[in-house]
Amino acid sequence: MSEQVALNPSEISELIRKKIDQFSVVSEARNEGTIVSLKDGIVRLHGLADVMAGEMIEFPGGVYGLALNLKRDSVGAVILGDSSTLAEGQKGKCTGRILEVPVGKGLLGRVVDALGNPIDGKGPIESSGMSPIEKVAPGVVTRKSIDQPVQTGLKAIDAMIPVGRGQRELIIGDRQTGKTAIAIDAIINQKGTGVKCVYVAIGQKASSVASIVRKLEEHGALEHTIVVVAGASDSAALQYIAPYAGCTMGEYFMERGEDALIVYDDLTKQAWAYRQISLLLRRPPGREAYPGDIFYLHSRLLERAARINADEVEKLTNGEVKGKTGSLTALPIIETQAGDVSAFVPTNVISITDGQIFLDVDLFNSGVRPAINSGLSVSRVGGAAQTKIMKKLGGGTRLALAQFRELEAFSQFASDLDDATRKQLERGQRITELMKQKQYSPLTVAEMGVSLFVVEKGYLDDVPVNEISSFEASLHDYMRSTHAALLHAINEAGAYDNEIEAKLKKAVEEFKNTGSW
């Protein structure tokens, strides 16, 4: 029989004490739930008692969801990305975080998805940090009046429906009427102005987006632009969050005292995606089967476009940027069905924005491009931001064009017209012809000023209507070659006084005497 080893009680207690001291509790308070149903990108979980609305839910395999429906016994969430790896019975955990996307100058020149992941094959993005996609819009006290223009380079817009920095200007029209073309021209025209641009493509074909990216690259505009894509093949959840993600990326520049321009192309498809999600979540449908909060979907997005004052910029940058205001200008696009602007989503967005550019399918088909209907289009705040030359020379253009459209309709029935009416019709035809502009060919303020000057002062009255575009092109070439200093002076200050008027008059008369057009 082996001898029993005598155990010293003090040694045992010392050993236990050491073990207790060395023991560390590594536990995390995580709220877990179980997937009870999964279909159409919507997951229902049981047991997530402490989840918050809009919170990220983590699933196995690094898949995330967004909590949207909070019920007494279950939580409805929408899957962000691929849900094929998930199955009923798997666990979902609360993260305590809301959805964030990367922001910063490293995103410029890149194409990203709705979550900020690069999809252009140019490697990882060097972002300045992460920022939540949902933010409270700037308050009344932190805002500043709009008094600086965003030059789109399009005569019809800059003269008649001016857009200011911090404004929300809706572009509305049927499909294939040139809505995207206006937005892309506006982005191209920001080259060299310091305005950063964000283009959000929602529910578009990958080939269409690739074509837009290629055009931006060709015109040297991609380097100041972020392209956010939630394509037609992406889930409804990504199409729903893409505008908010793009807005956050644009806000980064606004909050640092810079100017940014964001295009949402288009919000109709975002509304469709949100309607799909809401119906799958069994939310009660309302008018046109949209959920009750469809207005809030767009208002909370578009209210984030603003011009904020220097004090707010200083506060947001912790005193790094002083004496500079920041702005985010929004150009939302809405697609109408057969020109019906009184449908639910178009009327919602019209009431939220500061004006609209209405594109007419009949004008487009008759060759007037951009096909802007001057009678239905309006800019509620842009007039305060217009340069002096555009305000002075473009003021009568919109009225003359609107009157021309009315007279044109009546003149079809009248057999003989008096001289005043005939002159007004001829002037309207010349203005219509002058407002035509090729895509991807934005003009400077001075070039637009020269064009408006010749129509305002009657220098086009003896030019045949079919020769106006060649007359204008020749005039611009002449001005660039012989009066470059005058053009430069107008571009620098945007001013218009008696001296500039006299110089323009002399230059145009010289050009007409050459007969080179």
UniProtKB/Swiss-Prot annotation:
Catalysed transformations (reactions): ATP + H2O + 4 H(+)(in) = ADP + phosphate + 5 H(+)(out)
UniProt keyword Ion transport present: yes
Superkingdom assignment: Bacteria
Membrane topology: Peripheral membrane protein
EC number: 7.1.2.2
Compartment(s) where it occurs, according to its Swiss-Prot or TrEMBL record: Cell inner membrane
Broad enzyme group: translocase
Binding site for ATP: 173-180
Alphabetic keyword roster: ATP synthesis, ATP-binding, Cell inner membrane, Cell membrane, CF(1), Hydrogen ion transport, Ion transport, Membrane, Nucleotide-binding, Translocase, Transport
InterPro entries for this protein: ATP_synth_asu-like_sf, ATP_synth_asu_C, ATP_synth_asu_C_sf, ATP_synth_F1_a_nt-bd_dom, ATP_synth_F1_asu, ATPase_a/bsu_AS, ATPase_F1/V1/A1_a/bsu_N, ATPase_F1/V1/A1_a/bsu_N_sf
TM region(s), chain numbering: none
Molecular function as annotated in GO: ADP binding; ATP binding; proton-transporting ATP synthase activity, rotational mechanism
GO cellular component: plasma membrane; proton-transporting ATP synthase complex
Required for activity (site feature) positions: 377
Primary localization: membrane
One Pfam family hit: ATP-synt_ab
Record's function text: Produces ATP from ADP in the presence of a proton gradient across the membrane. The alpha chain is a regulatory subunit.
Subunit details: F-type ATPases have 2 components, CF(1) - the catalytic core - and CF(0) - the membrane proton channel. CF(1) has five subunits: alpha(3), beta(3), gamma(1), delta(1), epsilon(1). CF(0) has three main subunits: a(1), b(2) and c(9-12). The alpha and beta chains form an alternating ring which encloses part of the gamma chain. CF(1) is attached to CF(0) by a central stalk formed by the gamma and epsilon chains, while a peripheral stalk is formed by the delta and b chains.
PANTHER family, per database record: ATP SYNTHASE SUBUNIT ALPHA, MITOCHONDRIAL (PTHR48082:SF2)
Family: Belongs to the ATPase alpha/beta chains family.
NCBIfam families, per database record: atpA, PRK13343.1
Record-given protein name: ATP synthase subunit alpha 2
Native organism: Legionella pneumophila (strain Corby)
Name of the gene this protein is made from: atpA2
